[in-house]
Amino acid sequence: MTKSDGQGREERKALQRARILEAAREIFFRDGFMAANLDEVALSAGVAKGTLYRYFESKGDLYVALLAENGRAFEERMREVADAPGSASERIRKLGRFYFDHWTRNHTYFQIFWALENPAVTGDLPKQAVAAVIRLWEDCLRILADVIRGGVESGEFGPCDTWEVANILWTVANGLLQTEQAGPRRALLGAKTPEQAFHDMVELFLRGLAAPSR
């Protein structure tokens, strides 16, 4: 086999994998993780089901690969928002608006993203696939932690464990997004909309981070 033959084969494999991911994206987003059918994914991608399994060991593996691919685009956009001019507080507010707007517009994607934490839903996933998504989470958290660290270094925020604070803010933000999608839990917010509650949460965090006045 010549070098060009090998390159052609690799290109075909890459295109085939891309078609499977594109078909999975449409079906996962339409039906959700639990209802998504791999027979339909294979049919939509124009491949045999056995071919699909050569690339992805299970539905969970396919789901994680899809998240990792799309998550990188989210990370790049988040980094752009974080790098915008302004104080640390202003940039955290912008990140909050971006995060809320992105996930409320892509709520199905949010649901399957966090299904990773429920093995009963996803089944046993390959460690390498899970590691790819964990790296994505860590990279996004690092963006937020870096903004907080900049605020500490400038004296805008008081001293704190910036990684811990980023994790807490991230966790609370995701809890509010889950509330936004759950009818009974939304009622607990009273007259406030989920967006208002999310905004208030960010402001409370910023108050807690603010350096004591001298």
Predicted stretch roles:
Residues 1-31, 35-44, 61-64:
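Basic, helix-initiating cap at the start of DNA-binding domains
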Residues 1-4, 98-105, 138-154, 167, ...:
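C-terminal peripheral helix-coil segments that are non-catalytic and often amphipathic
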Residues 13, 63, 67, 71, ...:
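Amphipathic, non-transmembrane alpha-helical scaffold segments
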Residues 30-34, 85, 106, 154:
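Short coil/turn segments at alpha/beta junctions that flank glycine-rich nucleotide-binding fingerprints
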Residues 46-56:
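Short hydrophobic/aromatic patch on the recognition helix
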Residues 64-65, 75, 177:
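Short, Lys/Arg-enriched C-terminal cap helix and immediately downstream tail that follows
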Residues 65, 69, 79-109, 165-169, ...:
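Hydrophobic alpha-helical connector segments
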Residues 101-146, 153-156, 163-164:
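Short secondary-structure transition hinges
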